[in-house]
Amino acid sequence: MNRRRQKRPNWFLISLLVLLIAGFTYMDRFIIPTYQSPFVPTATATPPPEQYITQAQELFNQGKLSQAIDAYKQAQALKPNDPSIYVAMAQVQVFAGDYKDAQTNSEDALLLNANLSEANAVRASALDWQGNYLDAEAAVKHALELDPNNADAHAYYAEILTDEYLTGSGTSTDVLNTAIAESKTALTLSPNSLEAHRARGYILEATGNYEESIREYQAADKINDNIEDVHLQLGSNYRALGSYDQAVEEFGKANTLNPADPTANLLISRTYATVGEYAKAVQYAESAVKAVPSDPNLIGNLGVMYYSNVDWSDAIKELSLAINGGTTDDGQKVTSIQLTTNTHIVEYYYTYALVLAHLNRCSEALQIAQLVQSRVPSDATAMTQASAAIQICQKNLASSPTPTPVSSSKGKTTPVSSAVTSTPIPLATPTP
């Protein structure tokens, strides 16, 4: 019986199969996991929070405060339990004028670490800028209890005390001298601190030492020349010294850094009014109102500038809106501004009385003039202007005038008594 012959294996096919299996295995383990499909977005690594913090600091130095705040928010999202990020962001928010948000972030930092001196200090500064001086003073004192060598806290304390001195709201019996001492301590502890130089400049400005104040603000400006507030303060000091061109230049720099803030345009308008350039004053006052159309203070200032430019119809429109409240042409609600001892608000009221008198609306003019006389009897300028409004009305009544149309600079016609078409009573030099 013959044995069946066995078929010999095909070693070539076997080898090929083994190679194919090995190749597929290699691709599965090493090639496919690293392959990037052109149809799938490429994954990017999330930057560490430190990268965002560095970016925020660079943006702050460039004066890009809103972008710096956004960078801190990104760092905060990655590291939500780090109180130092909250504090750093709050400091920038104070410079940016976001005082409520600065207060919130400093308080959030304190929730993470109640004994953080810098968080208490920044909270104090935010409260100070909101006019809450008593709570600000309590917060900064606690910051100094936690760290007596906190230079920023000493600087903020000096500014808080200066505000208390200027508003007469301080509890200390020697507010001014304490503020001076605190500003000097801040500079001793940190001679290269922007906050320390700013605080020292502020107390010098408050005490009328304008040239020394300018030097301190210039020192702050050398540390960072992209801070709006420093340029505003420099401008105010130059204006107080009568250096109006330099004042306008500094206000212009401030406006460039933060065009959304109407403060610089407001101050430029008042500076031009001081030197009698009323057309320019009107231009910048209008720009300020465009930035915040519902602000009665800006509207009142615009009314004063219209009056100074002998544009009574527009002056009365703006002053009435500021003092009585109402709605702007584009539908924004304006809350009436109440008469206080603030020199600018007083100016809005007596200017309103004057323009009412010039337009022979004497019943209203007398009410406003008498209100000014009863509320601010110690303000000599206000008394003079209120009396002038009353005298105009007395002349109007005595002359029995015939209405005469007068066109404003914007082409509007307003019936005005022939007895009151003379040049308006000049206002006092606007208060810095």
Label for each model-derived stretch:
Residues 74-75, 108-109, 142-143, 185-186, ...:
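Canonical positions in the second alpha-helix
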